[in-house]
Each structure stands twice: as C-alpha cells, then as structure tokens.
Amino acid sequence: MFHHISVMLNETIDYLDIKEDGIYVDCTLGGAGHALYLLNQLNDDGRLIAIDQDTTALDNAKEVLKDHLHKVTFVHSNFRELTDILKNLNIEKVDGIYYDLGVSSPQLDVPERGFSYHHDAKLDMRMDQTQQLSAYEVVNQWPYEALVKIFYRYGEEKFSKQIARRIETHREHQPIETTLELVDIIKEGIPAKARRKGGHPAKRVFQAIRIAVNDELSAFEDSIEQAIELVKVGGRISVITFHSLEDRLCKQMFQEYEKGPDVPRGLPIIPEAYTPKLKRVNRKPITATDTDLDENNRARSAKLRVAEILK
C-alpha cells in the first residue's frame, strides 16, 4: 500500500493563492495529499496536471483522487519535461506550479525499491523504474573519481575518497549486490569516531547515489527554469526541499530571477527587459509546524520557498 504523509500540506497549496477555476501543476504527485487538498478548492472548470515518474504513485493517486478524476490529467514523466507536457495538452500558461522534492515514504520504506539503508534489498533507487541506470550500475561500474565526486558534491561526505576506495576494492572481487552490503562497506571507510555522530553513517552516500541515479538536481534546475516561463503573471511557484543542496539551488534561482539583468547606467526609464521576472513571497524559508513534526519526523528538514511571477 502506497501511504505517504504530505509535509506542509496546507502552506504549500495556500501560498499558491488558489483560483477555483485555475489550472495548476503538481510536479511530484507522490501520495497525492497536496493534490487532494488543492482539488477540493477547484470547481468543475479547474484543472490539475499531476506528474510523477513513479507508476506506483500514479496508480495509487487515481484511487486517492477518485472523486475528482474529471479535473485531473495524470502524466507519467519526469518534471524536467514540463514544457513538452503542457504543450502536448495544448496549455500555454498555468496559474501555479508546486514541487515536493522529498522521496516519498513508500519509496523509502518498501525494501524492494532499494532506497533505504535500514533494509536489505537489491541496489536500485530508481524513481522511474522504467529507466536503465540504477544504484547497482553506479556502485559497481562508475570509476573511483566519479564516485568521489558524487559523494562529495551530492552527499557532502567528508570521507568520500576513503569510501570510494573501499567500494573499488570490494567490487574487484565480486559485485556489490545489496543495500546492506554497501552499508557495511561505507562503514569501513569512515573512522569509528566519526561513525558515532551525525546520524546513520550511510545517509550521505545513499543520498548522493540516489541523486546521481535520478539526476535530481539537474532535473529540478531544468524544471524550475521552465516553470518560471509557464506560470501566468500573478501566479506562483511553491517548492518544498528536504536537503541543503536542493534548498540552495532553489534559493539561488529565485534570487537570480528576482534580481533581473544588470541595468545600464544613465537610462531615464528602466526597460521591461531589465525588470525582475519574479518576486520571492517569503524571504526566509517556511519550516514545518509542530503538527507536521508530530505526524512525520521527516518534516524536520523541510523548507518551503514561494515565488510570484511578475511578467
């Protein structure tokens, strides 16, 4: 059963300033909690485009949203294809777009998906189970230098070199097949003192591999750039992030589009081309409430950023 508790559900949707006949895009449908809350605010002229690359999530969402199916278009795709998705639906502009970038609880908790360092399973970590690249290929086939790079860049792991070297040594004898095999190897690469602090010792490397397998940061950057062009003037974009890499990227992109191009000196009037594309609705990220934390301890790291389109 696909059961997922949506984080900051009300805030994410309420900040979109919902119009009851508007067109909205859920880029990360997941457990459909945000979608259901939004659909309850739309009349029969409103519409939701619901995107997910996980077919299990889409199948579950059709059941969760069964009372609103006439208002929903389900799309099995990666959100980096946002422009093409809307073009294929003959939609030029929408009233709002939102993202929940967390890995859904079922993906983490179902051992067979290979995301969790708590359960033994084959190395997988594919959000889209139709794609070829999995964690198995990354761990067993990527060169030492590439592993060091992703562990450091995507996992901010200070022992990246030591862990990558351990992986390289082990796979010379036999392939690394399962999540718990990998956990043991990661532990070998981290000094005992360091293993006792900072959460689970495999957390950062598993995050890094997951991001690499699913090309998450690049896909998000591509998608946000498209979203900024696809939302109507006055429409909004809501983004929930769960780790510093995503949050930093979101913050930087919103700041860049809020700043606009450098204005040449001496102009009596600032041309529209030099005015900001958007404004940040909240200067600092919104964090989870005590209620969110009581329901879902994964909400502790969640941050919500919202931007409004100006032109």
Swiss-Prot record:
This protein is called what? Ribosomal RNA small subunit methyltransferase H
Query: What top-level branch of life does the organism fall under?
Result: Bacteria
Q: Which organism is it from?
A: Staphylococcus haemolyticus (strain JCSC1435)
Give the record's family classification: Belongs to the methyltransferase superfamily. RsmH family.
One Gene Ontology molecular-function label = rRNA (cytosine-N4-)-methyltransferase activity
Q: Where does S-adenosyl-L-methionine bind?
A: 32-34, 52, 79, 100, 107
Query: Gene Ontology cellular component?
Result: cytoplasm
Q: Which NCBIfam families match?
A: 16S rRNA (cytosine(1402)-N(4))-methyltransferase RsmH (TIGR00006)
Q: Which GO terms describe its biological process?
A: rRNA base methylation
